[in-house]
C-alpha cells in the first residue's frame, strides 16, 4: 500500500528487446502471460492478472548486456514452494537458462532465477506472506 494519498501502486514494467516476437513467445509460453494489446509488430503488452508488461522492440541503441540495461530482475510470485521447484524443472526442460538454482531463503521464501531470450533475469518466488493472497 502506498504512503502517498491516491497512489495505488506500480502499473507496469516496460522492457526494450531485440526481437518482440521472440520475447512475446517466451512470456506467453514459459510464463503463461496473455496479450492485452498489440498495437503493431514492434510493441506488445502482456498480463498475468493485475500486472502489465510492456515489450518494445529496439534496434538502434539496444544495450546488449544485462549489466548495461540497469535492470536487476523481474519477480513473479508463485503459489507454493513445491510449484517453484516444479517450474524450475519445466523451464530446464524448455531450454530456459537458469541463472541461480532453487534456494530456500532464511525468511522462509524460496526462489530460482532464469533469463529470458534477451538475458533479462526473472525470479520465480514463493513468499509465505504473499503467495496465497488474492488481488481483488
Each PLM stretch: what is its role?
Residues 1-21, 74-76, 128-136:
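N-terminal beta-strand motif that seeds the catalytic metal site of vicinal oxygen chelate
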Residues 21-34:
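Amphipathic alpha-helical segments
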Residues 32-38, 98-101:
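Short secondary-structure junctions
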Amino acid at each position: 500500500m502506498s504512503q502517498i494519498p491516491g497512489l495505488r501502486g506500480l502499473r507496469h514494467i516496460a522492457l526494450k528487446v531485440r526481437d518482440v516476437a521472440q520475447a512475446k513467445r517466451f512470456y506467453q509460453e514459459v510464463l503463461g502471460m496473455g496479450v492485452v494489446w498489440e498495437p503493431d509488430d514492434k510493441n506488445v503488452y502482456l498480463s498475468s492478472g493485475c500486472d502489465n508488461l510492456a515489450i518494445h522492440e529496439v534496434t538502434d541503441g539496444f544495450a546488449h548486456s544485462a549489466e548495461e540495461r540497469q535492470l536487476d530482475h523481474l519477480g513473479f510470485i508463485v503459489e507454493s514452494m513445491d510449484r517453484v521447484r516444479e517450474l524450475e524443472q519445466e523451464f530446464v526442460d524448455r531450454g530456459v537458462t537458469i541463472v541461480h538454482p532453487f534456494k530456500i531463503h532464511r525468511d522462509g521464501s524460496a526462489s530460482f532465477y532464469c533469463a529470458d531470450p534477451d538475458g533479462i533475469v526473472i525470479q520465480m518466488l514463493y513468499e509465505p506472506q504473499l503467495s496465497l493472497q488474492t488481488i481483488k
